[in-house]
């Protein structure tokens, strides 16, 4: 009987985790934070053995927090510049004669000195944080119903 309860709980976690994922994706699209689409494609839901993990690509948390100077300095400058170079391809800007390289250099320098503008403004709470309370409540309610409705004896 406990295995049956455990499987029902895992099913609830998978269901609610996927709803959470859809809400996060919707928030990313609504806030226009989807330049390359890599972050949206990276979000995964893993529910097994009564555990739920929702995860995404490295630095997913930066969508709400921005990048601090400390975090930017943890990366090699050339690595950071290369990441900015790749990201800049999705910006609606035309670069000619090495301007993309200068842009990448300047943005990388700025990140290491001041952090991103989002970080400087204190971050935001409308990508994933605002959906967490509903996720926890829905899981709690549904798991509670499973326990109440299961006759163990």
Which residues does each predicted region cover?
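Charge-rich, low-complexity N-terminal segments
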Residues: 1-46
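Charged, low-complexity interaction tracts
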Residues: 38-153
């Amino acid at each position: 009987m406990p295995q049956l309860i455990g499987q029902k709980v895992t099913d609830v976690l998978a269901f609610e985790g996927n709803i959470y994922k859809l809400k996060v994706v919707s928030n990313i699209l609504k806030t226009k934070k989807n330049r390359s689409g890599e972050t949206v494609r990276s979000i995964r839901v893993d529910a097994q053995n009564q555990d739920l993990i929702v995860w995404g690509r490295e630095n997913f948390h930066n969508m709400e927090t921005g990048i601090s100077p400390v975090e930017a300095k943890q990366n090699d400058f050339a690595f950071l510049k290369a990441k900015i170079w790749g990201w800049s391809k999705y910006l609606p800007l035309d670069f000619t004669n090495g301007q993309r390289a200068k842009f990448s250099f300047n943005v990388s320098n700025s990140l290491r000195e001041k952090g991103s503008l989002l970080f400087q403004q204190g971050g935001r709470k409308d990508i994933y944080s605002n959906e967490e309370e509903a996720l926890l409540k829905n899981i709690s309610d549904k798991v509670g119903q499973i326990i109440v409705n299961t006759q163990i004896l």
